A protein has these predicted regions:
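C-terminal amphipathic/interface module of NAD(P)-dependent oxidoreductases
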Residues: 3, 254-255, 276-312
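N-terminal Rossmann NAD(P)H-binding glycine-rich loop of SDR-like oxidoreductase domains
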Residues: 5-23
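NAD(P)H-binding glycine-rich loop region in Rossmannoid oxidoreductase-like domains
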Residues: 36-92
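Conserved Rossmann-fold NAD(P)-dependent oxidoreductase catalytic core, especially the SDR/UDP-sugar
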Residues: 94-142
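Glycine/proline-rich active-site loop of Rossmann-fold NAD(P)-dependent oxidoreductases
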Residues: 123, 162-164, 175-185, 220-230
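Active-site Tyr-X1-5-Lys
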Residues: 137-166
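Alpha-helical substrate-binding/gating segment
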Residues: 187-196, 202-237
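Mid/C-terminal beta-alpha module of Rossmann-like enzyme folds, strongest
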Residues: 220-272, 306-312
Length: 312
């Protein structure tokens, strides 16, 4: 069987480290709007994520398709950004589904990005694939995020790909050492003395170490009994104040100033982002992965943060 994996969104934060790690086991083809001639062993192919073209040939006989495309949500949700966030997810998913449907030899599996934010804001309930409740909560101001997540998965579900199983990666915050991710932001805040609890710090944070994310992706490619939504998250979500305590300890910072909700709202406005990213309580667990025997190398945040800090 071919070892070619086609990766859309391979130049973003998650795609960049994913392609590096899985390139040991697969031949990677990255679909990108701006191909580079020199990218090691990775092949880059041009696409515009809106129309069919020569790039569709890469799907014929491929082992898998992974779609991580989508504009970053780390921005203010004004009208233009809302449109870009939604379209960049829905349209890439739509055109990839159309390409698979037309393929002479379609890939047997399609992993499409989604988000753990699809679940309701909750403090006291674990959200898994079978019993998790989907929907917006006014307290968390997450209506737009839920709208995007549902439209994203609906587009995936509507794609007619009978020979290709489809998996929606409901991914939590990915902790990684590279620039551009949430961990480096939290680390910087901690070193500035701002790594305290936010809005009380009781909201749960769902997260996953970058290595476990990549291993889960490979697992889902190779285990063909998976289909539909899969939570890609550590089995141990923790309160935000506990997360910051761990980061402070590993960074050698003795204290962190707390922030109220209104302070967070002001800071989010100044930094051109949304407070929802921190306020919402996400208590997501990966029941399907655990039931199938997937072993997390970093199930506890203490170990995940320590491993990342050892590389920084």
């Amino acid at each position: 069987m071919s070892r070619r994996v086609v990766l859309a969104g391979g130049s973003g934060f998650i795609g960049s480290f994913l392609r590096e790690k899985i390139a040991r086991d697969y031949d990677i083809v990255v679909l990108t709007r701006s191909p580079h001639e020199d990218d090691g062993d990775v092949t880059q192919v041009r696409w515009d994520w809106r129309t069919l073209g020569e790039w569709t040939r890469e799907l014929d006989g491929a082992r898998a398709l992974i779609n991580l495309s989508g504009r970053s949500v780390n921005c203010r949700y004004n009208a233009r950004n809302r449109r870009d966030i939604l379209e960049s997810r829905v349209e890439t998913t739509r055109i990839l589904g159309e390409a698979i449907a037309r393929s002479r030899e379609p890939p047997p599996v399609w992993l499409n990005a989604s988000t753990a934010t699809i679940y309701k804001h909750t403090f006291d309930r674990l959200m898994d694939e079978a019993t998790g409740e989907i929907g917006a909560t006014p307290e968390a101001k997450d209506g737009f995020s839920i709208e995007v997540a549902c439209a994203w998965e609906q587009t995936l579900n509507e794609a007619r790909t009978p020979a290709t199983r489809k998996v929606a990666l409901r991914t939590a915050m990915v902790f990684a050492a590279s620039e551009g991710g949430v961990y480096r932001t939290l680390r910087s805040l901690t070193r500035w003395g701002l790594g305290g609890s936010i809005a009380g710090g009781h909201q749960f944070i769902s997260w996953i170490h970058e290595e476990d994310f990549c291993r889960a992706v490979e697992w889902l490619i190779e285990h063909d009994d998976f289909t539909g939504p899969v939570n890609v998250a550590s089995p141990n979500p923790i309160p935000q104040r506990e997360m910051m305590r761990i980061i402070r300890r590993e960074c050698g910072v003795p204290f962190g100033l707390p922030a109220t909700r209104w302070m967070l709202e002001v800071a989010a406005f100044v930094h051109r982002t949304e407070a929802e990213l921190i306020i919402k309580s996400r208590r997501v667990v990966p029941s399907l992965l655990l039931a199938a025997g997937f072993q997390f190398r970093f199930p506890r945040m203490e170990d995940a943060v320590r491993e990342i800090e050892d590389r920084l």
